[in-house]
Amino acid sequence: MLLNFLVNFYLLIPVWLIKIICIFNKDIKREYIFDPQSKLLIYLFPKLELQNVKNDEIKNLRSAIEKRRTNLRISKKPKKEIKKVDHYLDKDESILLREYSPYKVDNKNIILFFHGGGYVLNSVFTHDDMVAYFSEKLRTRIFSLDYKLAPENKFPAALENAIQAVEWLEDKNISSANISLCGDSAGGHLAASLTHHFTNEDKK
């Protein structure tokens, strides 16, 4: 319960307010100013016995974050309506690939996007506004993958889902040469891992 409260409280605080709070109390480490958001996060959150965190607590944390991200709308939204189509990579419809198509598309290239969250948190829905905004600004179709999360799904589940997404796109006559990989935080790591995977495949 305490963890959920702290997450909700932390997500409600605007960045500009955090910077004002910390402006007269800067921490300097190795000649660098410590990021105010990180400083507040460390201050608010108690040391957690991570081995005692249960799956139910993780699910509650996910739910709290998703609720805040979707209700607060902290990302910029596109000016024009973006067409969104949900595709599924499996028969059980457990792996979602959401397609974003802007009003005007400049080229045949597409972006395959992976959300961040330490492979444990977030989803296509927490990053929905952000990806739609990018699609409009870049005038490019973007596919956002809702890969399976840990700890329920062990490594390499997320990577396998990402491989499935590329194969699905290729089945739709989209050349791999026209696919750019992109992600934030853990999503960036997944994009790099996927690149490494296909680079090794090409060497075989």
Task: Identify the meaning behind each predicted range.
Residues 164-204:
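Primarily recognizes the serine-hydrolase "nucleophile elbow" in alpha/beta-hydrolase
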Residues 108-117:
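Short beta-strand element of the alpha/beta-hydrolase
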Residues 1-99:
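A glycine/proline-hinged amphipathic helix-loop "lid/cap" segment
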Residues 123-124, 130-131, 143-178:
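Catalytic nucleophile-loop/oxyanion-hole region of alpha/beta-hydrolase
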Residues 96-109:
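Short beta-strand-to-loop junctions in surface cap/lid or active-site-entrance loops
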Residues 78-81, 94, 139, 176-178, ...:
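A generic structural signal for alpha->beta connector loops
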Residues 110, 139-143:
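A fold-wide structural signal in alpha/beta-hydrolase
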